[in-house]
Amino acid sequence: MSKTILVMAGGTGGHIFPALAVAHKLRDAGWRVVWLGNPEGMEARLVPQHGFEMVWIKFSALRGKGILRKLLLPVNLLRGFWQGLKAIRQVKPNVVLGMGGYITFPGGMMAALTGVPLVLHEQNSVAGLANRVLASVADRIVTGFPDVIKNGTWVGNPVRPEIAAIAAPAERFAERTGALRLLVIGGSLGAQVLNEMVPQAMALLGESDQPQIVHQAGEKHIEALKANYAAVGVQAHCVSFVEDMAGAYEWADLVICRAGALTIAELAAAGVASILVPFPHAVDDHQTGNAKFLVHAGGAFLLPQTELTPDAIALIRNYSRSQLLEMAEKARSLAKPDATEAVAQICSEIAK
């Protein structure tokens, strides 16, 4: 008889995509996979596309400003716990896996209360509030970065198989000549500061220093981005979404991007040099911590948004392809290509 896992993840792609990788791995191994999500969250749109059974819980973030949110917190918690308990009784999982987002808190607490084995995966270098609380009741804790939570095991963040399968940096760079290849990733929302600063920086470069540019900006910002490049007379391939992320990493010599946990894992798995601009308003400034993982190993440059200027970005004129290859290899040395398998294996080991 096949076993059942209840996967809890929601809110952002950084939680959902790694959880999907594990969910697919377990389903391929014969497991029944059920997903606990918020009907108003990103997971409600993404997860059903992969054919997973859903159960729903309406639960809002524990953090937040405003007197009304604080007054309603007890009601929010009680409702969340009740719905979490109802989901566990309905699904009858052999193990529960929390992959991040506030949605994991009520389900995780009810798993512990009912004696269902609970595995937590923390993607970021600084543990989120839900995982910090749940860590005291979890049976196993695994992390995307080293030394995040006491008693946690560093397994890395699951990435898409096609990214983990990219050829080694030395092999990719072997026949590469001509202009440097610059990939700018703004994310699904488009990082407006990158959309404004990078075109201005490229305008400061001489013709011989001008890289080939692929710039992803998010659907809402694509026309403004094209106008920014046109205004400074710089050619760039502007896209709202990168369909083939593995192909984009494989093509690039250098990536400019934010420092979300999944992005860091992909940069390491692909083995590509990067300039990391952490999102300054991330909870607990966790993106700076994420970035330092690659920076301290020599695989990336850290450029805080407060120091982000066209002149600072234009310093890429000083980077040689051989230097970027060396950085790419250092980034690749930190990769955890078996992260998906490791999380799935731990779930299998402790399932009742």
UniProtKB/Swiss-Prot annotation:
Catalyzed reactions per annotation: di-trans,octa-cis-undecaprenyl diphospho-N-acetyl-alpha-D-muramoyl-L-alanyl-D-glutamyl-meso-2,6-diaminopimeloyl-D-alanyl-D-alanine + UDP-N-acetyl-alpha-D-glucosamine = di-trans,octa-cis-undecaprenyl diphospho-[N-acetyl-alpha-D-glucosaminyl-(1->4)]-N-acetyl-alpha-D-muramoyl-L-alanyl-D-glutamyl-meso-2,6-diaminopimeloyl-D-alanyl-D-alanine + UDP + H(+)
CDD domains linked: GT28_MurG
Membrane topology type: Peripheral membrane protein
EC number: 2.4.1.227
Main location: membrane
HAMAP family: MurG (MF_00033)
Protein name in the entry: UDP-N-acetylglucosamine--N-acetylmuramyl-(pentapeptide) pyrophosphoryl-undecaprenol N-acetylglucosamine transferase
